Amino acid sequence: MSRENATEEKTTKPDPIYRNRLISMLVNRILRNGKKSLAHRILYGAMSSTRRDTGKNPLLILRQAMIKVTPDVVVKAKRIGGSTYQVPLEVGSMQGKALAIRWLLTASRKRSGRNMASKLGYELIDAAKDNGTAVRRKEETHKMAEANRAFAHFR
């Protein structure tokens, strides 16, 4: 193993309109087939629809949604002595944000609606109100971790 310094954590550049790193992380996760301008259009459309529907700052709603969806613990399958255990593990802040973004996007993709921008907007509003598919996913993960708390020493 190298004795050099540990590699620096990659940071994303803030987006041009809101000047926020969280939004650029979201854009990079929305991205499909290298079409970044389309990803920007989808996210900015979602932000404008949240502003229109709630009358509040969409960045504030996004932050609230991220707080409500970000998990504290996850379960990871670990094979010990021929049987597989679901071992609960704590999640770091960056990994938690990445999971929250992924869950928000998968929930909004599965949602019925006209276009991705409106579906993402409604999912953000629901998550900020503490309901919605992404929040349910976080609660299921926490329940699973609580149920398998006995295996926490297998880390």
Curated annotation (Swiss-Prot):
Question: What's an example Gene Ontology biological process for this entry?
Answer: translation
One example of the protein's molecular function in GO is: rRNA binding
Q: CDD domains, alphabetically? A: uS7_Chloroplast
The alphabetized UniProt keywords are: Plastid, Ribonucleoprotein, Ribosomal protein, RNA-binding, rRNA-binding
Q: GO terms for CC? A: plastid; small ribosomal subunit
Q: Which InterPro entries match?
A: Ribosomal_uS7 (IPR000235), Ribosomal_uS7_bac/org-type (IPR005717), Ribosomal_uS7_CS (IPR020606), Ribosomal_uS7_dom (IPR023798), Ribosomal_uS7_dom_sf (IPR036823)
Q: Which SUPFAM superfamilies match?
A: Ribosomal protein S7 (SSF47973)
Q: Which Pfam families match?
A: Ribosomal_S7
Record localization: Plastid
Give the record's subunit note.
Part of the 30S ribosomal subunit.
For this chain, the family text in UniProt reads: Belongs to the universal ribosomal protein uS7 family.
Fetch the NCBIfam families from UniProt.
rpsG_bact
Protein name (record): Small ribosomal subunit protein uS7c
The protein's gene is named rps7
